[in-house]
Amino acid sequence: MTQSLVCPDTVSRVSSVLNRNSRQFGKKHLFDQDEETCWNSDQGPSQWVSLEFPQCVQITQLQVQFQGGFSSRHSCLEGSRGGEALSKIVDFYPEDTNALQTFSIPTMEVDRLKLTFEDTTDFFGRVVIYHLRVLGEKAG
């Protein structure tokens, strides 16, 4: 059964936070299901989010909701398991829209993920994400 794989024991990291204001724009807002909060990166050539799961998971879908004008035209999902080096799972190409976008992911068992957001629509390279959902199943 497909479910959200991000849990309280999932360790998340981000490339940057706008003005280092984690309280208002921090990574916790990626997963809080609140329409009023977001992760807002600082400027830079590319931005990323990494996730370390407490156990192996099988990812089937990724859902991302950007703020229009602060999205990524090209994104890359990488994963690994058991301390191995990250390897590319898939490239995906989000639209510059406020809508929640769903991307099917080739099924792969991982305990670590990294999403890299490249070619941002913002001139300064900032990314704003209201929702990030990693869907799939816990590996058994």
Curated annotation (Swiss-Prot):
Q: Which GO terms describe its cellular component?
A: nucleoplasm
Q: Could you tell me the keywords of this UniProt record? A: Nucleus
| Keyword Nucleus part of the UniProt annotation | yes
Q: Does the keyword Membrane apply?
A: no
Q: What is its main location?
A: nucleus
Q: Where is it localised?
A: Nucleus
Task: Return the InterPro entries for the record.
Answer: Galactose-bd-like_sf (IPR008979)
What does this protein's UniProt record list under function? Answer: May act as a repressor of NR2C2-mediated transactivation by suppressing the binding between NR2C2/TR4 and the TR4-response element in target genes.
Q: How does it assemble?
A: Interacts with NR2C2/TR4.
Per the similarity annotation, which family is this?
Belongs to the NR2C2AP family.
Q: What is this protein called?
A: Nuclear receptor 2C2-associated protein
Source lineage: Eukaryota, Metazoa, Chordata, Craniata, Vertebrata
